[in-house]
Amino acid sequence: MKKVIALAAALLTALCACADPNAFSEGERLSDSVKKNQNAAETFNYADGASEPPTSYNNYANAVTDFSLKLLRKRLDVTPGKSVLCSPANTALTLSLLSNGASGDTKSEILLQFGGLSADDLNTCGSYFQSRMEEVAQTQRDKKAEDYDPLDGAHVSLLQNLTVSQNYDISASFLQKSADFYGADVIRVSFDDEKLEQKQRSLLSGYNANASVSADAGSSLYALTASSLTDKWLAKHTIEEGEFRGSGSAEKTSFMVSDESYLSTDAAEGIVAYTADNPLKFIAVVPKNGVSVQDYIDKLGNAEFDGLLNSMKAGKTVRAAIPCFSIDGGSKALSLRSALEGCGLHTVFTDDAHWKYMNITDRIKLDDLYELPPSVTVSDSGILAEAQTGGVIKPNGNDKQVTLNSKKELRFDKPFAFFFIDNESNIPVYAGVYQ
């Protein structure tokens, strides 16, 4: 999907140079110089015809889920008491991409984050995961239509971007792997270019029209992720008014009410709801026994996460009342360096790191990995998650006559954790806490 966006932008620029004078030039877009391998047997790209994941996919899913939960903990530690939303899967994809350029202990450090899988495993598994996420909702659309826009309507889009100083060459083999497995935008520029911020904003305009990335003139290389999700709910909801007791005072809000699959462990309970077009499940979880959501996330690991998902039984439902809510991530790219160092990437961002397979001189340095923080609006109208939403989607109130059969009720009227996870691998595409 990202290649479609990039090619469309490039075509528009070629047809009318005045349309976007701040776009990166053809010479700056190193990724555009490489032709993607479309052999699905080698790349496991779902859009190119891959129907089964690689044999190492289960191990990959477990490793990325574990990493995602760690990253959520670190993100929540930075802003205790505040709502948080991130796309840990996209960060994992970016680190996987970078592993192709890393060498020595730097490469080992990245691979250890994902259970010691090889870089080749990360490439093929990441390619299958990302391409499936981005393609499923697009299969019913005419991609050849003049008005086709991959970010219009139901979609998932995960963007990875590497921006490198013009002082460094990037190896052809690294660019080829980036194209084959990730479709990342690899840009080479002068970091003291006074138009750099405008150019980056142009690149990210499909995700956030006001995106801001702070890069020092002496920078060598930085990575950036951005993401977008839009969909409707598979099930219908009725609307009830109530109060949400967050970290501050209680606030009146609208609650979406529906029968949903019930989850429960000794530590927490929750629900599973499904999106209509994307291959995603929405998981909402509230701790038991008076435990705060912060303390619950601090201890949340694969065992508890799997326990929740495995507790789902056919026909076991609950009358779920979920608040309509929004989280505003803003437009400034957030540094993940400290959070990733806390996850165990101790040397990746230092002068001791080695990137010989990205730059043969091995002089390049990764200054930071940024995320353009997604915002989210969740209501009975659906889900809108992007770098910055335009505002709250108001409840439409069209489903007042929904029949509810569940006797047990679970109200999410206090801080809770939530996830949008892949319905095949259970990898968290988005992870957050609303409080």
Q: What is each residue range found by the language model?
A:
Residues 1-4, 8:
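Positively charged n-region of N-terminal signal peptides that target proteins for export
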